[in-house]
Design a protein with these regions (language model features):
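A contiguous, low-structure linker/loop signature
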Residues: 9-64, 83-84
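Active-site loop segments of alpha/beta catalytic cores
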Residues: 24, 51, 56-301
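Glycine-centered secondary-structure boundary/capping sites
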Residues: 1-2, 19, 28, 153
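Generic structural signal for short, solvent-exposed loop/turn connectors between secondary structure elements
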Residues: 1, 17-19, 230, 245-246
Length: 301
């Protein structure tokens, strides 16, 4: 189900060389994609630079009743999902995150002050769209969690202040939590890279009750967070870099997973995507070891 922009049409390739490709998307974004390395995309022109851009996207690409949002075999998919033996989630492309993907971090940071009405409209319009689509989905299926993609922090700290979060983001998160409660969905999970601790208490106040991936190199301390916030669930939290540092480093991190699981409310995993300097042998060793840790360790043990 598409809870993002709809009806974009095909990308237009502006340049294609042996090392990079430059593409214009249907929403107007132009980005350069590097063909090697771990971090590939550089945005050259954002889709929204002013209110006119936003009105164009809002009118053309954010219709909740666009038939392309649901697959043609939706009814068959529903029957398949009703028989599942795994958790099922609803996707929200972020309160901050959705605006960020349209405007970029810098322009959005200015817009919070220079055009707050525009920011409120983007955030409110997108969450209204998501809730509308979710209503149709929850009418025929039960869901276990709602995941919100945010990425509102880097290694050195958060991209927004607590005051900005409270004023702009909190009202939308409370709408999401109200929807979750009304449909007996217990978990609202936020995905944000970087050092997210300064916003954690506000997220919990707003209805979020689980976070991931708790990047280690950004300074996140999962154990401290779990002890400080007894209603918080955590996922990730294991340093992905150890998979390129050898078995001794991996064993130390796996032992740390034991300790964190014992605290409770924690599902261990790499704290970001695995980088290209990791061999398959090292990856397999770490993941097999992690599986054993998970199967053998219980909260409170």
């Amino acid at each position: 189900m598409n809870t993002d922009l709809a009806g974009l049409g095909p990308d237009v390739v502006l340049e294609d060389t042996s090392i990079q490709r430059t593409v214009r998307r249907g929403d107007g974004e132009v980005h350069r994609w590097q063909k090697d390395g771990d971090y590939h995309v550089q945005v050259l022109h954002w889709a929204v630079s002013d209110r006119n851009d936003w009105e164009r996207i809002k009118t053309r690409h954010l219709a909740a009743d666009d038939p392309s949002r649901f697959p043609p075999d939706w009814e068959a998919e529903v029957e398949r999902l009703r028989a599942r033996d795994y958790p099922l989630q609803l996707i929200h492309w972020g309160v901050y995150g959705f605006a960020r993907t349209l405007m970029g971090d810098e322009a959005l940071a200015f817009a919070f002050y220079d055009d707050p009405g525009l920011v409120h409209d983007i955030l409110d319009t997108y969450t209204t769209l998501a809730l509308h689509i979710w209503e149709r989905m929850t009418a025929v299926l039960d869901f276990d969690l709602i995941e919100c993609w945010e990425d509102m922090a880097y290694r050195s700290g958060c991209l927004i202040s607590p005051a900005t979060f409270r004023h702009f983001l909190q009202p939308q998160y409370r709408r999401i939590r109200a929807f979750a409660d009304a449909h007996r969905i217990p978990i609202v999970l936020v995905d944000s890279d970087g050092y997210i601790e300064p916003l954690t208490a506000l997220m919990l106040e707003s209805g979020v009750n689980a976070l991931y991936p708790f990047e280690v190199q950004s300074g996140n301390d999962v154990a401290s967070m779990l002890h400080t916030h007894p209603m918080l669930g955590a996922l990730g939290g294991l340093d992905k870099r150890v998979m390129s540092q050898g078995r001794t480093a991996m064993d130390v991190e796996l032992e740390r997973a034991h300790t964190l699981i014992r605290i409770g409310r924690f599902i261990p995993g790499p704290d970001h995507f695995v980088l290209s300097d990791v061999t398959y042998a090292n990856y397999a060793y770490f993941m097999r070891g992690l599986r054993q840790v998970v199967m053998e360790t219980r909260p409170g043990s």
